[in-house]
Structures are given as C-alpha cells and as structure tokens.
C-alpha cells in the first residue's frame, strides 16, 4: 500500500543526471529526506555533502545523505538513473545491452528491502527499462513508470516558443510514444493560447509563414542528440523533468504528464510501456488519459509500440 507524506526519496545513480535531479529536489524542497545510492559510496557521499552544504540558503531544509538499499524500505519514491553517457548521435536503444544488467541488479536490491512505493525509471531506453522494472519487481502497474516523453513534450513547447517568440508555457499538447526515434508529436492535441496550433498558424500567416510543423517535430526529436554532441550529455532538462514528476506524485497534484506507463488495452495496445498522457497521483500512474488521436497518430503509436515491444523480448 503506497502512503505519501512527502517524506523520503531515494535516487540510485549519482552521475550527471542523478546528481542534478537531486539538486532540483533539494532546491525545491520537495521532500523531508533524500538518500543517494551509487556503486561508488564515496561519490554518493560527496554529492550528499555538497548538496547539504547549501541548506542555509534553501527555502525548505531537505536532509540529504548517502545510504544503501536498506533505505528503500520506507521510501515513497525510488528514482533509478543508472547508466552511462551515450555517444553523440546514438540511438537510445543502443544502451539496452549495457543498462539492462545494471537495472536488474538495482531493482532486485530495491525490492529485497521491502520497498512498496513508486519506481520512477530514468535509465535509457526508458520505455524498455520501465517495462523490465515492472516485470522484475512484481509491483502493481501504477507503481512503476518512466520519464517517457515528458522531456520531449517540454522540448516541443520550448521549440514552438522559439519559433513563435511566445512563452512556451502558453503551449498545450503532447509528444507521445517511445522516448526515442519513433516518438511523434500528436499535432491534434497541440494548441497555443487555447487555439489549435494549425489554426493559430493559419490565422497569423503574416507573422508565422516560415514556421513549419515538420521542422518543429524534427527539432524536437533530435534535440537530445544535439545537446549530447555539444556538451557530452544531457542533465538539466531531464533532471527538471524528474523533479517535476517527483513533486507531482509526492504532493498528489493530479497533473497529467506524458510518462511511460503500462498500456493494458488503451489505444489497442497491451504489455508495453509508452509515453502517453497520464494522471499522476500519490499512488503513481493513476490513470491513462486516452486521447482521440487521428488515424495517422494512432498508426505512429502502434509503430512505436512494436519497436519497444521487440526490444523487451528475451529480457526476462
């Protein structure tokens, strides 16, 4: 039984993503206690002390410490970020062979502690790893989710903001499917200031004649690789995404976020994790919001599901 009191979060993996996610959780005061676990105990201890040293200047004190898997027993959320930096222009699925062994070991250790909270998977390929963690953990479907296309959706809104010069927070809509090459922008859901995006462009051709939805979608898809090529990895965007998901669950905000969650009949798919709009509550991925997608969008979603499902085969 999941019980949430904004008490305790554990992050497994203190590389760039894990450490930056920890920073976001601490600076926003999202929980009472944050525990860091890493294969290098010294690394986890160093990050914990570095984070804790800024406590005087935080709005709300979060106790940060290094720990071990026994700390997962009473944790509300365990965030899994283990993995390695991908090379530039690589496919996220290429990380599967390396990551699956790490994730399997982590999940086994987490569950051996008696954990009964929510697992938030960040490790890539995140849809495959979320499915694998769900199968391996034996937890209910609501209690295992991945970051999915939440970051991609944020990227879409940012890019639309760049193209139009408007605040990206005015943009509604979702990127759906795999967090990877087969992701797609569900343009039927995208709006700007409450107006369907296609209609917005048509009504403002004098200002936005050069704006192309095809180019926006491609920029969204390749944004991650561009960042990796420029700086060697991504950490701020995904860390903000993780912190947002953690806050939404811990604070029972009931926000709709396109996380990677198990499809069990929704959109005609079964036994696959994909990024789809999902109501997040204190119990995790509470309910999938099934949208009225266009025929083309449904075809793209099914294609994405097939790719993810193929990579899940043989993992157990």
Model-identified regions with their sequence ranges:
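Beta1/beta-strand and adjacent pyrophosphate-binding region of the FAD-binding site
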Residues: 7-11
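Glycine-rich Rossmann-fold phosphate-binding loop(s) that bind the pyrophosphate
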Residues: 14-15
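N-terminal Rossmann-fold NAD(P) dinucleotide-binding loop
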Residues: 18-19
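Conserved S-adenosyl-L-methionine
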Residues: 27-33, 138-140
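Conserved N-terminal Rossmann-fold NAD(P) cofactor-binding segment
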Residues: 33, 37-76, 309-316
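Rossmann-like NAD(P)-binding element
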Residues: 56-118
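Rossmann-like NAD(P)(H) cofactor-binding subdomain of soluble oxidoreductases
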Residues: 92-157
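C-terminal substrate-binding/catalytic lobe of Rossmann-fold NAD(P)-dependent dehydrogenases
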Residues: 137-142, 153-316
């Amino acid at each position: 039984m999941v019980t949430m009191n904004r008490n305790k979060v554990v992050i497994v993996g203190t590389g760039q993503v894990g450490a930056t996610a920890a920073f976001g959780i601490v600076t926003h005061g999202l929980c009472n206690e944050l525990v860091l676990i890493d294969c290098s105990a010294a690394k986890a201890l160093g990050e914990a002390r570095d984070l804790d040293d800024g406590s005087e200047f935080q709005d709300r004190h979060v106790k940060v410490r290094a720990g071990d898997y026994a700390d997962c027993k009473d944790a509300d959320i365990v965030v899994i970020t283990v993995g390695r930096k991908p090379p530039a222009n690589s496919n996220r699925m290429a990380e599967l062979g390396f990551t699956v062994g790490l994730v399997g070991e982590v999940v086994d250790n987490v569950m051996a502690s008696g954990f009964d909270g929510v697992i938030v998977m960040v490790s890539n390929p995140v849809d495959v790893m979320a499915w694998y963690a769900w199968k391996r953990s034996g937890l209910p479907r609501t209690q295992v989710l991945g970051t999915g296309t939440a970051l991609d959706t944020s990227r879409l809104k940012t890019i639309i903001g760049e193209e139009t010069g408007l605040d990206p927070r005015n943009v509604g809509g979702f990127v759906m499917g795999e967090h990877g090459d087969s992701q797609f922008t569900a343009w039927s859901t995208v709006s700007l200031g409450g107006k369907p995006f296609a209609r917005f462009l048509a009504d403002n051709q004098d200002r936005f004649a050069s704006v192309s939805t095809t180019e926006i979608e491609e920029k969204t898809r390749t944004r991650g690789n561009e960042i990796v090529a420029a700086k060697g990895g991504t950490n701020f965007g995904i860390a903000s995404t993780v912190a947002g998901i953690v806050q939404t669950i811990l604070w029972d905000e009931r926000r709709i976020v396109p996380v990677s969650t198990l499809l069990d009949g929704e959109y005609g798919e079964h036994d696959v994790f994909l990024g789809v709009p999902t109501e997040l509550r204190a119990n995790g991925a509470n309910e999938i919001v099934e949208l009225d997608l266009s025929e083309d969008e449904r075809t793209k979603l099914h294609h994405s599901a097939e790719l993810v499902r193929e990579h899940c085969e043989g993992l157990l």
